[in-house]
Amino acid sequence: IEGISFNAAERGQFNFFFFFGLNDATRYREVVEGIEANNFTFGSIGLSTNYLQSATNYAQGWKVGVAGTNRNYKGAARATYSSGLMENGWAFTAQLAWRYTPYIDIKGQIGEGIAYNSFGYFLTAEKQWGKDKRLSLITFGAPTRRGQSAAVTQETYDLTNQYNKTSWGHNNYNPYWGYQDGKVRNSRIVETYDPTVIASFDWQINEDNFLKAGVGYHYSMYSNSALTFYN
């Protein structure tokens, strides 16, 4: 992101849940294949991607969207605003995004037993001095809470249908959910939040030399619940 690597230290991979719902914020990027020459990385097996998030990369104006589906996401809304480069040398871009589904407590329905609630935010500010220097400050995050579904074998589908004589034997069966004290509960709740802050400085020294420096802070939070049973 802006030339700074945010691959996970444990696995070396990039976690795309940083950006849940922030489609407009991640619209502009550079992609290179393998060890192809580029200006942001040494390359690697597969693809390398650099997200460009300075405020002046975004088209000036408003963008608002609302969506509804009958699948895992029941509703979504997002709004994006970009000021463009102003006379004082500043530019700002911001996006808010929200995706939601309540608990699906109808057996046989796609996504039964799951719930989803995600709020994403993105803000970038850029200051330019002349045509050769610019400083960008960027922050984003997407706190998310979601219920999971299980990978189930065909044998499980067949058995639930045989012994319960209900619609449980369909291919949407999810054993992770049920009722507790009369309320729907999913035993496998995942909560994620990865707030990130970036400062990036670009300086076109002359026609042949360009300086890019950046520093970033990233905090990762991931939790996953489960239930156990005692006699």
For each predicted feature, which ranges?
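Transmembrane beta-barrel wall of Gram-negative outer-membrane proteins
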Residues: 68-102, 106-149, 197-199, 203
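Short beta-strands and strand-coil junctions in structured, solvent-facing domains, enriched
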Residues: 7, 35-39, 101
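Extracytoplasmic loops and strand-loop junctions of Gram-negative outer membrane beta-barrel proteins
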Residues: 11-14, 31-33, 61-65, 104-108, ...
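Short sequence motifs at beta-strands and strand-loop junctions characteristic
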Residues: 41-43, 69-73, 113-117, 180-181, ...
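Acidic/polar loop-and-plug regions of large Gram-negative outer-membrane beta-barrel proteins
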Residues: 122-128, 134-198, 223-231
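Transmembrane beta-barrel architecture of outer-membrane proteins
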Residues: 44-46, 74-76, 118-120, 192-196, ...
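Short acidic/polar hinge/loop motifs at secondary-structure boundaries
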Residues: 4-33
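Short strand-turn segments of transmembrane beta-barrel domains in outer membranes
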Residues: 28-40, 46-83, 109-110
